[in-house]
Amino acid sequence: MPKNILVIAALPEEADAFHPGQGVIAQTEPHPMRVIEQAGRHIKIVTCGLGKVNAALAVGRYADADTALVAMTGTCGRIAEIEGDTFWITRAIQHDYGALGGERISHYRAGDWPMGEARDPAFTAMSDPGSGLPHATIISGDVFLECPTAANSLAEKLNAQLVDMEIAAVAQAAEALDLPWCAIKAVTDSADGESAGDFSANLKRAARKAAEAMERVVELAAKW
């Protein structure tokens, strides 16, 4: 019965924040990977790099027949009013996938044929096992969003509160492999003109908040 867990993080700071200093370095290339033994299972923590392609490649490369769960920990931007700073992700949408007509994109579920009637574009995470976190929908795309006008438009159109560059691709890859997925993200910035500075200033603090919450979820998963 599969029992191991694959934890994906985009950045070294996000990966290092998960059980910091524990485990062994299994490899440094092409993706840094640390392995922790916990409750009779292996937890692989992989740094995938930025963007949807890197995220999906990491899932495809490191999820195997012994993988029970694909998880992502890390940071994000806030694009709509929502209380809290660390969130259990319930739905993930690729905001740059679809059909572009004029200056307007019609969003489709990533991988679907982008013509005709579109179904719900969101990938749905596994049920929250008891994280105690507020729930949110996140959108992912291969851009660092620092425009409040674009952020507000996407938030309204896709009924989303958060943005990052990877989770929806992790979700798509996990679903293709018939694996459950989950994600926890902590906010660094507000996807506006101050985002670059705010992200840098808040990265390590937010990464640790997300990682601490993911550590608790992984402990809960040990009881499955």
Show the residue positions of the predicted features.
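Structural motif
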Residues: 6, 68-71
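A C-terminal functional module that forms or caps the active site or interfaces directly
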Residues: 143-196
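Mid-sequence, gly/pro-rich, charge-dense loop/helix-turn segments that line enzyme active sites
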Residues: 76-158
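Alpha-helix C-terminal capping segments
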Residues: 61-65, 79-82, 172-180
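Active-site-proximal beta-strand elements of phosphoester/diester hydrolases
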Residues: 43-48, 137-140, 184
